[in-house]
Swiss-Prot record:
Subcellular location: Cell inner membrane
Protein name: Multidrug resistance protein MdtC
UniProt GO molecular function: xenobiotic transmembrane transporter activity
Transmembrane portions of the chain: 15-35, 333-353, 360-380, 387-407, 431-451, 463-483, 528-548, 853-873, 897-917, 953-973, 984-1004
NCBIfam families in the cross-refs: PRK10614.1 (NF007905), RND_permease_2 (NF033617)
Pfam families found in the cross-reference section: ACR_tran
Membrane association type: Multi-pass membrane protein
Main location: membrane
Cellular-component GO terms for this entry: plasma membrane
Assembly notes: Part of a tripartite efflux system composed of MdtA, MdtB and MdtC. MdtC forms a heteromultimer with MdtB.
InterPro entries: AcrB_DN_DC_subdom (IPR027463), Acrflvin-R (IPR001036), Multidrug-R_MdtC (IPR023931)
Taxonomic classification: Bacteria, Pseudomonadati, Pseudomonadota, Gammaproteobacteria, Enterobacterales
UniProt family annotation: Belongs to the resistance-nodulation-cell division (RND) (TC 2.A.6) family. MdtC subfamily.
Length: 1026
């Protein structure tokens, strides 16, 4: 009591303390970063290696495997996957959450160095690594277009100057430049001209390499001067290479231009990028795993004026895609929802109390509690994101509850004629323990969340801590500022035998009288209520098992990502045509604002597209509805498929897949994997619970298999190395020399001119110069026949892997899809040599499913322990927790009614309900116990009186919590997919709980009281003195 008096009788000190909390909160709010969700990105590092011309199998065995063995020894690696394609290997390392990305990068570099001696010769550069997740959607895409500059020249400018500058911005992890490749001098050989001149391809290669050297020449000096020696030992342009003498035939010089076309071109002509209908160079910017997306985007935008100032006038630099506008719009929606919740809660208080002065007290307590929370959020390193702001929105109903309980009890004493300061002190003393019990038991609900590991634990930690801090500050404010304001602002009134009945007051009195009448009937029919209570418990179990489940609500971020998968034998020219066709279909959709895409590189039959939709206010359809509409149009394109998915703020795993969810097949036998993967994929494609089923296993690419006759080769004086070198020189886009320029290094690329390699007959024109100097056609010692070969070889760990990706049809939940996949795998009878498991988001969902019930039980157990300690009783906590089954039924029925699956957000709602609905029981039980102790009432009289006396605060607190959550249900616009499941769960649970617990709680209270008396009689024995 002295504690309360200290603040009630010292108003200046109390006001200043509240002002200090508010000022700290305002300062914290200004310093808090902004993000879509809490930081939950796994540390990911990507290792890249290249060997131009090498087959996928060669890359997997000679490059990927040595690197994987070395990288696999690094501590903290959670998952290692690799993909090897034509001339390229990419290894993705996903580390544990607690692994520092910079320390991991040092370990990766050390592992690369250790594996260097095991890698094949001829690699143009050492393997490199990047601290970015390639499966993440870019946070921003910039495009460069020009009417006068070539694509190669644009690419050079983008990669040499723009990408380097952008990469230095804080938060940027990777700048991937696509759409073309670096400039190069391309030597297109004419096989017939070479044969006529008796010049081998190796001879051409060696002549070019020898003519373009960069070596130090030294200096000459005398006693006075020093001269640096400089020679014209470098050739830099196609015009300089054309007159190069490569051979003498009967004393006549054979120049390079005689046997080849030499052009200024690009390193890899099999690359194409587009924005809308124009050829373009794309700069795809990804953030570091630990970086804040909004701060990073703001840093890039701040740099754009400087970038535009440095580019030539002939180049047009545009932002093709920016993730931040929808994130900002979503957060603005949450902030507006928070403001509406505060207003509705204050309105509820006013309608019940019918006093402007009384309403002003919680109207001050709520902002102080919420604003003060920002200071703690800043100190904890949190951000303003959808979850933390939703926590504050929900907290609105909680923080006002404490103030309402104190205010209502003080107002009751004032209505009885007590003086204001005395009423404030007496009223606060009576409900102080109740408020503390309510707050501590509510915070206890979130303790299991704080101890939860993995991605769900990281994701929910900010929500739990933010809400707990808001409740803690609210507790302090309600026991200090609220009673002080009541004592100094409210006035006592003369006791009335008949309360004034006006408006809401008349309705409340009528409700209270009706409740009293119905409660008497219920207390006389306790068995029927007991059956209802047990029915809600059983219904809870059935609903939880039956309701569809998912990991996280599908968001409409306004950004779509698409993966193109064409026939495995498609040419680059045909693939570029497919890209253009798909982009036209998408560009013509009324909901699309911008589309960019690229194809080429090591995987000729694949491409990527990034689609920006119009803002939510300018389109009627959701992102999923747009995808459904486009899927029908895109299916008409022959020879290729485009798989679309909405970009999400949470992306788990480092695999690049053409759909949102993945199921991975592993085997130590590549043959077994290749046998069973098509069967499994075909079976999964037939499931109605899955859509867009596709696989990264591509082993039907067209291959020309050359079979050497080694005996003939030996007789003709030809070795295998010379034959392989011939093929590499002719068809491998072989980089044979380096051109050094001040800003970059460029390559000289040699291959047979595409005019002479349009079909298989090009092999018949190839020849090798043997040891006697004779030209021997390839057909003399080799035979070839077409075959199928993999376009890529994938590993997970050190096992062969194939990932089947899939999306969900509209109306299907992830739990239904995973159950269907598991059932299909069992029915197929897949042998133990092929192992299947979910990966990425689907894997995290499976883990979350296994821990959900444990988490709910742990929360209930924690609340029970806290209540048991506070009440010094094993029984009373059970009475209080009896309110939970009805809330669970209401929440699950509401989700079913709105056709919303049970997600991680809905789980938060269930956890919140555990904390909310028990408040009603706490208020009843506290007053009943006090009435039994001090008033000498029977348990029946005590609980009946407690229910009637606490009816008004129970209605006020429940309606405050309900109206605090209602804006989440009704909210639309950006980010509503996250807010609505939380609001639906809470509103549904509160409505059902309010209808039932007003009757079940007193019945359960009496049941346990009678049980206690029965056991006490059995155990009572007379005390015998010895």
């Amino acid at each position: 009591m002295r504690f309360f008096a200290l603040f009630i009788y010292r108003p200046v000190a109390t006001i200043l303390i509240a002002a200090a909390i508010t000022l700290c909160g305002i300062l914290g709010f200004r310093l808090l970063p902004v993000a879509p969700l809490p930081q939950v990105d796994f540390p990911v590092i990507m290792v890249s290696a290249s060997l131009p011309g090498a087959s996928p199998e060669t890359m997997a065995s000679s490059v990927a495997t040595p690197l994987e063995r070395s990288l696999g020894r690094i501590a903290g690696v959670n998952e290692m996957t690799s993909s090897s394609s034509l001339g390229s290997t990419r290894i993705i390392l996903e580390f544990n959450f607690d692994r520092d990305i910079n320390g991991a990068a040092r370990d990766v570099q050390a592992a690369i160095n250790a594996a260097q001696s095991l890698l094949p010769g001829g690699m143009p550069s050492r393997p490199t690594y990047r601290k970015a997740n390639p499966s993440d959607a870019p946070i921003m895409i910039l495009t460069l277009t020009s009417e006068s500059w070539s694509q190669g020249k644009l690419y050079d400018f983008a990669s040499t100057q723009l990408a380097q500058t952008i990469a230095q911005i804080d938060g940027v992890g990777d700048v991937d430049v696509g759409g073309s490749s670096l400039p190069a001098v391309r030597v297109g050989l004419n096989p017939q001209a070479l044969f006529n001149q008796g010049v081998s391809l190796d001879e051409v290669r060696e002549a070019i390499d020898s003519a373009n050297v960069r070596r130090p020449q030294g200096a000459i000096e005398d006693s006075v001067h020093r001269w640096q020696i400089q020679t014209n030992d470098e050739l830099k342009t196609a015009a300089e290479y054309q007159p190069l003498i490569i051979h003498y035939n009967n004393g006549a010089a054979v120049r390079l231009g005689d046997v080849a076309s030499v052009t200024d071109s690009v390193q890899d002509v099999r690359n194409a990028g587009m924005t809308n209908a124009k050829p373009a160079i794309l700069l795809m910017i990804r953030k570091l795993p630990e970086a804040n997306i909004i701060q990073t985007v703001d840093g890039i935008r701040a740099k754009l004026p400087e970038l535009r100032a440095m580019i030539p006038a002939a180049i047009d630099l545009q932002i093709a895609q920016d993730r931040s506008p929808t994130i900002r719009a979503s957060l603005q929606e949450v902030e507006e929802t928070l403001a509406i919740s505060v207003a509705l809660v204050i309105l509820v208080v006013f309608l019940f109390l019918r006093s402007g002065r009384a309403t002003l007290i919680p109207a001050v307590a709520v902002p102080v509690s919420l604003i003060g929370t920002f200071a703690a959020m800043y100190l904890c390193g949190f951000s303003l994101n959808n979850l933390s702001l939703m926590a504050l929105t929900i907290a609105t109903g909680f923080v006002v509850d404490d103030a309402i309980v104190v205010l209502e009890n003080i107002a009751r004493h004032l209505e009885a004629g007590m003086k204001p300061l005395q009423a404030a002190l007496q009223g606060t003393r009576e409900v102080g323990f109740t408020v503390i019990s309510m707050s501590l038991s509510l915070v206890a609900v979130f303790l299991p969340l704080l101890l939860m590991g993995g991605l769900p634990g990281r994701l929910l930690r900010e929500f739990a801590v933010t809400l707990s801090v808001a409740i803690g500050i609210s507790l302090v404010v309600s026991l200090t500022l609220t009673p002080m304001m009541c004592g100094w602002m409210l006035k006592s009134s003369k006791p009335r035998t008949q309360p004034r009945k006006r408006g809401v007051g008349r309705l409340l009195v009528a409700l209270q009288q009706g409740y009293g009448t119905s409660l008497k009937w219920v207390l006389n029919h306790t068995r029927l209520v007991g059956v209802v209570f047990l029915g809600t418990v059983a219904l809870n179990i059935w609903l939880y098992i039956a309701i569809p489940k998912t990991f996280f609500p599908e968001q409409d971020t306004g950004v779509l990502m698409g993966g193109i998968q064409a026939d495995q034998s498609i040419s680059f020219q045909a693939m570029r045509g497919k890209l253009q066709d798909f982009m036209k279909i998408i560009r013509d959709d009324p909901a699309v604002n911008n589309v960019t895409g690229f194809t080429g590189g090591s995987r000729v039959n694949s491409g990527m597209m990034f689609i920006t939709l119009k803002p939510r206010g300018e389109r009627k359809e959701t992102a999923q509805q747009v995808i459904d509409r486009l899927r029908v149009k895109l299916a008409k394109e022959p020879g290729a498929r485009l798989f679309l998915m909405a970009v999400q703020d949470i992306r788990v795993g480092g695999r690049q897949a053409n759909a949102s969810y993945q199921y991975t097949l592993l085997s130590d036998s590549l043959a077994a994997l290749r046998e069973w993967e098509p069967k499994i994929r075909k079976a999964l494609s037939a499931l109605p619970q899955l859509a867009d089923v596709n696989s990264d296993q591509q082993d039907n690419g067209a291959e020309m298999n050359l079979i050497y006759d080694r005996d003939t080769m030996s007789r003709l004086g030809i070795d295998v190395q010379a034959a392989n070198s011939l093929l590499n020189n002719a068809f491998g886009q072989r980089q044979i020399s380096t051109i050094y320029q001040p800003m970059n290094q460029y390559k000289v690329v040699m291959e047979v001119d595409p005019r002479y390699s349009q079909d298989i007959s090009a092999l018949e024109k190839m020849f090798v110069i043997n040891s006697d100097g004779k030209a021997i056609p390839l057909s003399y010692f080799a035979q070839w026949r077409p075959a199928n070969a993999p376009l890529s070889v994938n590993h997970q760990g050190l096992s062969a892997a194939s990932t089947i990706a899939f999306n969900l049809p509209t109306g299907t939940s992830l739990s239904q899809a995973t159950e269907a996949i598991n059932r299909t795998m069992t029915q197929l009878g897949v042998p133990p040599t092929v192992r299947g498991s979910f990966s990425g988001t689907a894997q995290v969902f499976q883990q979350t499913m296994n821990s959900q019930l444990i988490l709910i039980v742990a929360a209930i157990a924690t609340v029970y322990i806290v209540l048991g300690i506070l009440y010094e009783s094993y029984v009373h906590p059970l009475t209080i927790l009896s309110t939970l089954p009805s809330a669970g039924v209401g929440a699950l029925l509401a989700l079913e009614l709105f056709n919303a699956p049970f997600s991680l957000i809905a789980l938060i709602g269930i956890m919140l309900l555990i904390g909310i609905v028990k408040k009603n029981a706490i208020m009843m039980v506290d007053f009943a116990l006090e009435a039994q102790r001090s008033g000498g009432l029977t348990p029946e009289q005590a609980i009946f009186q407690a229910c009637l006396l606490r009816f008004r605060p129970i209605m006020m607190t429940t309606l405050a919590a309900l109206f605090g959550a209602l804006p989440l249900v009704l909210s639309g616009g950006d980010g509503s997919e996250l807010r609505q499941p939380l609001g639906i769960t809470i509103v549904g649970g509160l409505v059902m709980s309010q209808l039932l617990t007003l009757y079940t709680t007193p019945v359960v209270y009496l049941f346990f009281d009678r049980l206690r008396l029965r056991f006490s009689r059995k155990n009572s024995k007379p005390i015998v003195e010895i």
